[in-house]
């Protein structure tokens, strides 16, 4: 199975850290859409349009704000479960099977939300644009 990654850099505890996001497969992406579907129509009405198309980034924030605490936790756990942090010895999973694999993020809500937002935007960008994903894999295995 091919895995597609995207790297992002975040400041965690005063240190720049590189995170590797694994793109959601088609089934997980569809589940993500199913989770968010009830909030999309309202967000789409409020989002600004660029060249007649709604920008995905403008949709995600209002959807995040509308999610119930349980839905937000489910979304974050999915995104963090598809994320690794680059350490000196190699990549370490951020979360595995609902447990923190890299506990430095456990109390860093801002970084966890940013990772979740980046993951959602990247995984859904092709859906709203009407074409396939525009992201190019930085690394595939």
Regions found by a protein language model. Name each.
Residues 1-11:
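Short acidic, Pro/Gly- and aromatic-enriched capping/linker segments at domain boundaries
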Residues 21-25:
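Short, proline-centered helix/strand-breaking motifs
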Residues 26-141:
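Short, surface-exposed, charged amphipathic helix/loop patches that serve as local interaction elements
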């Amino acid at each position: 199975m091919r895995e597609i990654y995207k790297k992002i850099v975040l400041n965690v505890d005063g240190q720049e850290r590189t995170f590797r996001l694994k793109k959601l497969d088609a089934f997980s992406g569809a589940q993500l859409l199913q989770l968010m579907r009830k909030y999309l129509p309202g967000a789409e009405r409020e989002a600004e349009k660029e060249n007649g198309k709604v920008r995905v980034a403008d949709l995600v924030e209002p959807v995040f704000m509308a999610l119930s605490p349980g839905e937000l936790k489910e979304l974050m756990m999915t995104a963090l479960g598809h994320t690794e942090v680059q350490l000196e010895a190699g990549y370490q999973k951020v979360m595995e099977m609902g447990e923190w694999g890299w506990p430095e993020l456990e109390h860093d809500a801002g970084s966890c939300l940013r990772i979740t937002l980046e993951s959602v935007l990247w995984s859904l960008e092709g859906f709203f644009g009407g074409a396939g994903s525009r992201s190019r894999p930085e690394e595939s295995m």
